[in-house]
Each structure stands twice: as C-alpha cells, then as structure tokens.
C-alpha cells in the first residue's frame, strides 16, 4: 500500500508564481529558510579560524578539485581568483608527510612526490564518501602509490607515515591551504566558504565534503555543483538561453543543462560519472608506457614505486603537451637498472597514439550527455551554448566529441580551471547579499526513496527535482500486529533496493498492533539547498515521529570530526611555530652579518676585551641558530646586540676621539651602527 501525499515540489512553472521568500536560502539574507541540515548552528560552534588576523565577513568560493584546487573572492560585483604563495592561480590537490613529520600541501608536496611516493597523497576526492569495499575503491587501490586502508567504520581511508587519514581530512588540509591563500590576500581571517562538488556526488559524498570544511575551520555556507558554478560565472554578464556545461576534470565528469533567464539560473537536468577524469587518462598512458618498457627491456616498472612515480609525472606532462603539439618526447634517464647496468626510458609519443589509448574513456562521456538532454526534455539543437570546464576539455579529441554530441563547436567563454571557483565566489556574494540580481535553482542528481516490500526501491523524489524540496508518501505495515518499521533510505536509479546506494536507516517504533495495511506511516524527505537529506517517519495514528539527517552508514562521527578539528589546529600551530623559527633564524643570520661587519670596521678602535666579548656572542648565536630552540636563539640575538652596543658606548666615551656611533652628535663620520635585527613577535 503506498498512497502518495505530496507536500510540496518546486517545479519550473512555480518559479513565477511562488513568493520570492520561498527561495530565501539563495537571497540576500544568507540564511537557508528551507535548510534542515544536521549541521546547522552546530557547525558554527565548532568552526575555528586558525589565524590571528582580524575577523572578516567574506564568503570565499573554493573549487576543491581532484587534481587542482582554486579559490576566489568577490571584489565588488565581480569574482577574483586569488594567487597562492607560489604565485599560481591553482594549487595542486596534493598532500605529503615528509620524514620530519611535516605536512606539505600543494606545489611543495607535488615537487617531492618522486622521492616520497608512498607518503604523498593525491586524488582523494575520488575516495571521499566511499566504502573500502566499493568496486571503484578497489580499482583506485591498484593505481595509486600510497596505501588505501579500511577504516573502523568500513570507509576507505589512506595511510601515510604510519598514520591513517580520512579523505575528508586530506580535503581539509587542501581547504586550509585555500583558506590561508584567501586570508593572505584579504588581510583578515576567513571562516565562511562556498565549496563546489561534482554534480553527480551522492549524499554521503556531499556530507564528507562538508565535514572537510568543518575540519579546516570553515563554515561551509553552501555546497554547489561544479557545472552550476561554472554557468554562474559565465552568465553573470547577462547571458541568456539554454546552456550545456561539459565538465571533465581530474577525477570526475559532469554534464548539466541550465536555462538562464532574467538572472535566474535554473538547472534542468544533470548527469555524470564520478570516476572518469584526467587521472584515468594518465593511468591509461602510464599502463602503455610500462608495457612498452617491459617489452623492450624485460623489466616491469610497475614493481618499482619510485620509477612508477617518475613515469606517472612524465605521463601527465606528455598528456598536457599533446593538447597543443602533435607529438612529444618522454625522456627519463636512469629510470631503473639491472645486472647489465642503468636503463633509460626514451619514447616519442604522437597525439594520434595518445587519442587511441584514451578513446574508450572519451566515449564514456556520450551516454551521460544524451541522458542529460533526455531528462531536460530538449534536443541537442536547442542548446544555445556549450561550455567547457575542467582541464581535460583542452584535449582536442574531447572538444571534437563535444562538437559531435551537441552539433556545435563548444564555447571558449570561460577559463576551464577557474570558472568553478569564480562561480562559487558569486554564490558567496549571493548569500552575503552583495549580488542580488542572480537566483540559482539547482537539482538533486539522483533519485531518493526507501526500500519497500520485496526489496523494491520506491522513489519519493526523482532525479533532477529542483531543490530545496520536501515530499511525503504514506506507507503501511507488511505484517499483522507489526509494532515497528525499519526505514532504509536509498539513492540511485536502479529498481531493486540492493542495487542502489544505502544512505542510512532508522526504526519507527511504538506502532499500535493492527492488521497489516491499517497503520498509516508517513515518510517525508526534505532536501536542503546543499542537496543534503533529512528523512522523517510519522505514525499518523499516534503522532510519533522518528527523524534523522542522513549520514552514510560509515562517515565521520561527531567525535571523529572534533578530533580532526583539533588535529588541524595542531598542524596550524606547528606550521606557525615552524615559520617563527625560520624567521628567527633569518634574523640571527642578518644579526651575525651586521655585527661582523661592524666589528671589522671598528676592531682597531676598541679594546681587545670588547672585541673578544662580541666574537664570543656571535659564536654563541651561530651555534644556537644551528639548532631548533626558538627561545635560545632569541636570547642569543639579544645578547649579541647587547655586546655590539659596547662599540657605541666606547666610541661615545671618547676613547677613539669620534662621536657616538648611532647617536645624534653632529659630524660623526665613524659611526658604528648596531646590528640590524627584526623582533619576531611571539
């Protein structure tokens, strides 16, 4: 028995007639009126800014990518991408732990990957929200140089330097880097962000991404889909019409169809593959190179982690070069060695050969595109513009496939690497109230429902329903005198419950004993603007209600998250202490140089005991600065400066007949300035 009781559904035809307050979660109030997420105010109480800078009210936009990440902020009515400390506009999504236990993020981490492959973690976005037993996880384990392990809750975690980390934790390290990049630019602390995710991410993956933000000390104001964010950045200049966004990034593929009209961005449909991206292209090329070397030299490089990492980086570089050239050389001297001596790897790779190797991957983008157009109820001819997003869309073969699918050349109107972050910053501007003329109506990518009698998946909310939304349906018991009902919440498109993703389960107890089919149990699904689901079950006879915000059967517990927040703060504190130590050592070097220069100039004019005292102080400072005791180095800097000040005291006393060095007397040419030094604040 399943009598539908529809509470509310936001559809296209309601956009005009519905009061604007119905979409308040996207308006200037910045508060989600339909938001029933479990996070709510609790996340704000635990979010901390790991910075001593003054608090700011900016909402930054972060594209947390599989391969690269990017951060942007609103300047007036326009989004601006912020360069990182290395001067780049994107940051590699790579985290490493070196032998000293130091945490490296971004370019420094990627740079040392060849010599430290097992402790350098990348591409963890593909693991976020996934189980260890997931077939995709098992596939990924064979491709990465680091260890993927089973967490106590059954999730897929990674291991580095003997310690286990959740993908959310690794994501948090990258988000922290993005946060610090924004803070350095703005000159104030940042605690709020809009973070993007692939449109085809399920609820567990969205929750895990939000957890990553929380661990990084960020209150994630909104999770938005990457293609939607790209469309926002494209459409902010009053563009209108039907837009298809083809987003092929480092690890995931999404395609969305949107209609832009009078500042309203309405997502009509979305589709994709969360395990298709640049990493798969790299791996296809890597397999080819390994096999080529095995054929010519009889050595399997797949068994040599260091050689494999060098080859992986060469494959990625070759892939990038072949987007703009017809052929490239891969030269890796001393890649390995055997009894006959050192072996070198040298091969010429043509674009046509590369395209042959990855053609099966490119072809996998066809079906999601066709299904997306079908769900949107339009033909390819009706699409006005096709936007390319993600670094992999620079591959000429990908562009030709897009042109073939949609019947038109794709637009180059957005930067494939930066459009998503810019759109996220725009959404932040909408939430803050700085951007009032844009309204975003997104959709849920997958159907949501429960398991009913016979193991059937009964949908309550179908895919591509505009969010936020809330729907209910009345069910009954399957047996006589049944006093409790188990509610299994699922997400997917298969007809049988076991073939779909189990998001969570709970029990409604205390149902009065009755014949089967008599009790009235109302199940309600509520999806907020982040795409996060709350499910409740109500016995209409007794009024008893059981409600949960969906957490995957794995996922991070509250204790896990708080522990990781503390660890993130500890890492931030260690980084701060390390920077202070380096700055103080630099000050010590400058002090030594200046004192020795002054001593050289005035040695003949001061008593030998003063010169000896200064030399001893410099020797002590040099010895201290070779160690890591911050307080000792500071004390020795102070002692050295006190010793060198005696030159000035002696000279001002008239012993050398000159005026006081560094003093205010007129005409003194032989002045001995004290050593330059910079006081490092604690």
From Swiss-Prot:
Organelle transit peptide residues:
1-50
Q: Name one GO biological process term.
A: response to heat
Tell me if ATP-binding is a UniProt keyword of this record: yes
**Reported induction:** By heat shock.
Q: Which GO terms label this protein's molecular function in UniProt?
A: ATP binding; ATP-dependent protein folding chaperone; unfolded protein binding
Write out the coiled-coil annotation as residue ranges: none
Q: Which cysteines are joined by disulfide bonds?
A: none
UniProt keywords (A-Z) are: ATP-binding, Chaperone, Mitochondrion, Nucleotide-binding, Stress response, Transit peptide
What domain of life is recorded for the organism?
A: Eukaryota
Residue spans with biased composition (Acidic residues)?
Answer: 673-682
Glycosyltransferase in keyword set: no
Q: Where is this region: Disordered?
A: 646-682
Subcellular location(s): the record lists: Mitochondrion
Q: Name one GO cellular component term.
A: plasma membrane
- PROSITE patterns to which the protein is assigned, alphabetical: HSP70_1, HSP70_2, HSP70_3
Q: Which InterPro entries match?
A: ATPase_NBD, Chaperone_DnaK, Heat_shock_70_CS, HSP70_C_sf, HSP70_peptide-bd_sf, Hsp_70_fam
What segments bear the compositional bias annotation Gly residues? 651-667
Give the family, as the similarity comment puts it. Belongs to the heat shock protein 70 (TC 1.A.33) family. DnaK subfamily.
- Cross-referenced PANTHER family: HEAT SHOCK PROTEIN 70KDA
Which NCBIfam families does the record associate with it? PRK00290.1 (NF001413), prok_dnaK (TIGR02350)
Summarizing the function annotation, the protein's role is: Chaperone involved in the maturation of iron-sulfur [Fe-S] cluster-containing proteins. Has a low intrinsic ATPase activity which is markedly stimulated by HSCB and ISU1. In cooperation with other chaperones, Hsp70s are key components that facilitate folding of de novo synthesized proteins, assist translocation of precursor proteins into organelles, and are responsible for degradation of damaged protein under stress conditions.
Name this polypeptide is given: Heat shock 70 kDa protein 10, mitochondrial
- Organism source for this protein? Arabidopsis thaliana
| Lineage, broadest ranks | Eukaryota, Viridiplantae, Streptophyta, Embryophyta, Tracheophyta
Point out the gene that encodes the protein: HSP70-10
């Amino acid at each position: 028995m399943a009598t539908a009781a529809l509470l509310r559904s936001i559809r296209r035809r309601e956009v005009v007639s519905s009061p604007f307050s119905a979409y308040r979660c996207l308006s200037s109030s910045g508060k989600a009126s339909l938001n029933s997420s479990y996070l709510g105010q609790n996340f704000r109480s635990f979010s901390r800014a790991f910075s001593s800078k003054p608090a700011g009210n900016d909402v930054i936009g972060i594209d947390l990518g599989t391969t690269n990440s990017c951060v942007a902020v609103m300047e007036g009515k326009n989004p601006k991408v912020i360069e990182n400390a290395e001067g780049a506009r994107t940051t590699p999504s790579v985290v490493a732990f070196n032998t000293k236990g130091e945490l490296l993020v971004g370019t420094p981490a990627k740079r040392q990957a060849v010599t430290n492959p097992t402790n350098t973690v990348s591409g963890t976005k593909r693991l976020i929200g996934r189980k260890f037993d997931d077939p995709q996880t098992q596939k990924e384990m064979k491709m990465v140089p680091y260890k993927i392990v089973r967490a106590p809750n059954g999730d897929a975690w990674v291991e580095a330097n003997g310690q286990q980390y959740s993908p959310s934790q690794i994501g948090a390290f990258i988000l922290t880097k993005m946060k610090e990049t924004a803070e350095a630019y703005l000159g104030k602390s940042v605690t709020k962000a809009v973070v993007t995710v692939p449109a085809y991410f399920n609820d567990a993956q969205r929750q895990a991404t939000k957890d990553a933000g929380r661990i990084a000390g960020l209150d994630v104001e909104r999770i938005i889909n990457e293609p939607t964010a790209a469309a926002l950045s494209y459409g902010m200049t009053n563009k209108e019409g039907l837009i298809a966004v083809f987003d092929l990034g480092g690890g995931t593929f999404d395609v969305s169809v949107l209609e832009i009209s009078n500042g309203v961005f309405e997502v009509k449909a979305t589709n994709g593959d969360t395990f298709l991206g640049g990493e798969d292209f790299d791996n296809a090329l890597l397999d080819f190179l390994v096999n080529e070397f095995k054929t010519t030299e009889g050595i399997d490089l797949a068994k040599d982690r260091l050689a494999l990492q060098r080859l992986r980086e060469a494959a990625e570089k070759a892939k990038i070069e072949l987007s703009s050239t017809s052929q490239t050389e891969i030269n890796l001297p001393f890649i390995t060695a055997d009894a006959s001596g050192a072996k070198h790897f040298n091969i010429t790779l043509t674009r046509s050969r590369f395209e042959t190797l990855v053609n099966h991957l490119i072809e996998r983008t066809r079906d999601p595109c066709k299904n997306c157009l079908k769900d949107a109820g339009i033909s390819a001819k009706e699409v006005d513009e096709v936007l390319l997003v993600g670094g992999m869309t620079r591959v000429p073969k990908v562009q030709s496939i897009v042109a073939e699918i949609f019947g038109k050349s794709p637009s180059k109107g957005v930067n494939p690497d930066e459009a998503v972050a810019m759109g996220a910053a725009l959404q932040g501007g909408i939430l803050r109230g700085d951007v009032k003329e844009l309204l975003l109506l997104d959709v849920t990518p997958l159907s949501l429902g429960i398991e009913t009698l016979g193991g059937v998946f009964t949908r309550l909310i179908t895919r591509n329903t505009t969010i936020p939304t809330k729907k209910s349906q009345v069910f009954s018991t399957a047996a006589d005198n049944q006093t409790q009902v188990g509610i299994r919440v699922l997400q997917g498109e298969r007809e049988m419950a076991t073939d779909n993703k189990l998001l969570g389960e709970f029990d409604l107890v205390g149902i009065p004993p009755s014949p089967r089919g008599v009790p009235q149990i109302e199940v309600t699904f509520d999806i907020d603007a982040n795409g996060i689901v709350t499910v409740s079950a109500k016995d209409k006879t007794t009024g008893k209600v059981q409600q949960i915000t969906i957490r995957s059967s794995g996922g991070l517990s509250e204790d896990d998250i708080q522990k990781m927040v503390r660890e993130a703060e500890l890492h931030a504190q260690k980084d701060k202490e390390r920077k202070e130590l380096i700055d103080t050592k630099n000050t010590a070097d400058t002090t030594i140089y200046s004192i020795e220069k002054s001593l050289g100039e005035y040695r003949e004019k001061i008593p030998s005991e003063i010169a000896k005292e200064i030399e001893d102080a410099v020797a002590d400072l040099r010895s201290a600065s070779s160690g890591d005791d911050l307080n000792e180095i500071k004390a020795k800097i102070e002692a050295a400066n006190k010793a060198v000040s005696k030159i000035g005291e002696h000279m001002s006393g008239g012993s050398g007949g000159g005026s006081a060095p560094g003093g205010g007397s007129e005409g003194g040419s032989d002045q001995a300035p004290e050593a330059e030094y910079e006081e490092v604040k604690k």
